[in-house]
Amino acid sequence: MNKHAHSYIDSRWFEEYQKLSAMPGLSSFRADNRMQEKHRFFKGEIENPTFVYQSLAHYPYEARRNDLRELKKQIEEQEDNAALKKMYGVKIEHKINDCNIIESIQRKDDARYDELMQERYGSISLEIGIAVIRAYCSALEKVIETSRGNVRDAAKELHAYLDEVKSRFHVDSVHEFHLVEVSGAQEKILTARGIKKLFELKRKEYGLSDWRIEIDLWGRSNSISVRHKNKRVVIPRGRRLTRPQALALAEHELGVHVRRREHGEATKLALLGVGLGGFLWGEEGLAKYYEKQVYEGAINSSLKSYLLTALILGVDGRKRSFQEIYNVCELIFKSMKGRYFLTEVKSSKHYAWGKTVKLFRGATGQTKGVCSRRQLVYLEGYLRIKEIISKGILTEEQLMRGKYDPANEAHVLFLKKLSVL
């Protein structure tokens, strides 16, 4: 528990919930044999990889699930505050869902995994999907007009592919997206040390004196991560970003994720520091919104992830395999790298492999249309937050009050009853 524990209205339940909620998250679902499968895939020995998650093989999901159900039962029987009881019930059900997800991975049950992913993250929005495809087609037309050689050939192939997808369904959409040109030719590329300096400035700006910014010298991940438990933001030593990108990510990680954690812990509700059930859309949507205020090109990654997930799930009625999405990723790299997105990866095949593996995380890789679906959250959450801010429904101070979804009416009503909002 933290320094505010004495004033929490949920102190009776929070500590026990925290103990039981500690389990592998989706970001840790990395196939143990991914390097072997990568080698076989590149040699053409297999059409699609078969991922094995041995590190999850011995996780006691059944015992943890039973303990969570017992805690939920205790809260239902002993908690007098009906609204608090409901919020904890929803949060615990999310953790039970996590146990079910781990079980489906252990059993290599793609059908069950897909069912649970849909339960957690929902289905693809056809309106958003068609708008994203149109945005890609429009951007590719510019590439075709202004490029030549291999870049133009890849753009023409990808445009033809997406145009065919688009022709299979006709949906009106109120959404209109544009990929932002982000050429970094004139931008200075920062190393991990340079990125750390910018993060330190942002940390001081927000008065986050308890937090540390560190460079990870040994980790393999290329993603900047926030580790709330010991108040650290970790930057991989090989990370390279332009100055605008680094400033935007500092706003994303420190300005939103860390500040919401700190502000949530300072309220009377301990759960608000770790997140109400279903808070992710608000959390990532707000982070993307503020990131985009600093760096317009930040929206491109969300559009790309939504496009690829939509193709996997079959936005046009045809589900797709690992191999087909890998091919699309290669074409994106060849036709749009340097113009619509920047990456340190120099090889199209290594870029495509890394992106596709992330999309199919948790699945075996053998079943068309089965992927993590988590990538849907970023663009959908951004659109929800954008609407709330444009309508002035909540102030910036209220948006940052803790980890909840400002677009979730139940969250807002609950927090207003507690006078947190």
Residue spans of the language-model regions?
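Post-HEXXH active-site segment of zinc metalloproteases
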Residues: 58-64, 68, 244, 259-283
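N-terminal low-structure segments adjacent to metalloprotease catalytic domains
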Residues: 1-156
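Conserved alpha-helical "signature site"
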Residues: 301-421
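Primarily short, surface-exposed interaction patches in extracytoplasmic proteins
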Residues: 195, 218-220, 233-235, 279, ...
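Secondary-structure boundary elements
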Residues: 201-210, 257-265, 289-301, 391
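Short alpha-helix carrying the canonical HExxH Zn2+-binding catalytic motif
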Residues: 245-259
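Post-HExxH zinc-binding segment in Zn-dependent metallohydrolases
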Residues: 273-317, 381
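Contiguous, non-catalytic segments that form substrate-binding/exosite surfaces or channel walls
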Residues: 82-241
